[in-house]
Each structure stands twice: as structure tokens, then as C-alpha cells.
């Protein structure tokens, strides 16, 4: 395992590209601290490790979409931490430095009475992209429908009169 990790790190720093970039160095040291802005114009970021952090006003980073967070603190009782030290990054850097955190999964969910199927690419807790799936895995589809019926009830189904009569007799 250590040999694989050493080889991966060596590949990422070969050559001049990124070797002296502070964001790249921080991202290699702490890949779980790569952070993406949660909404346009927001000072709130989500780190790959799942922690939300806030960039203080006047930080001098010019409102970047991505940061490599070197130091963050969180006060007791607060849900978000504060960024104390960070370097401006981008998605390309994040993908290179934290390639082990990249995952692509198919998700099929029951949402408001409908089945939603999508392919989601993530860097840790950060969603990079979502694309609809036309033909989801039948097992995932079945599980989503079962969850939907369990939460919404059998009233969602259209029952023929004979089936309704049978259910009423069985309920007796």
C-alpha cells in the first residue's frame, strides 16, 4: 500500500508542473482539505472530507471556486469551521492531487413520487458532476421503488377492483 501511494505521489510531482504551487503542495499533504465553494458568491465551502468551512471577509483570495485549505478551525458548538490559511486551487489541481478520492457511482432514489436515476462523480464529499441515467441498474431501481412504497404507502399503486376486493377480504 505504501509503495503504491509513494508511486502515485511521485507521478503527480514529476516535472515542473505544480511542484512549486502552494495549493498543490497543500492538496498533496491534505487531500481531504480540498474545498469547493457551495454556491456562487458564497463564502461557505465544502471540504472533500465533508466539513463545511467559511472564508472570512477580506481574505484576499478574490472569491475562488476552489481552495486548498492548510489550516481551519472550528469553535465548539458551530457547524462550520473557519479557514485560517488557504491557497487558491482549481478542479484540475484537485483531481490530480486527490485522485484517490475520486468516485463515480450510480444513484437511484425515490423523490416526490418519482424515481430519479443519475450518475454522480465526487471528490470525497464534493459533487463534481451529475448526469441523468436512462436505463439504471434493475437492482437499484427496485430498491428505490421499494423505499418509495415503504415511505408513501401502497396507495400509490393502481389496484384493479378485484385486487382491491381481495385486499379488503384479507384485511378483515
Residue ranges and their predicted role:
Residues 1-44, 65-172:
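Acidic, serine/threonine- and proline-rich low-complexity intrinsically disordered segments
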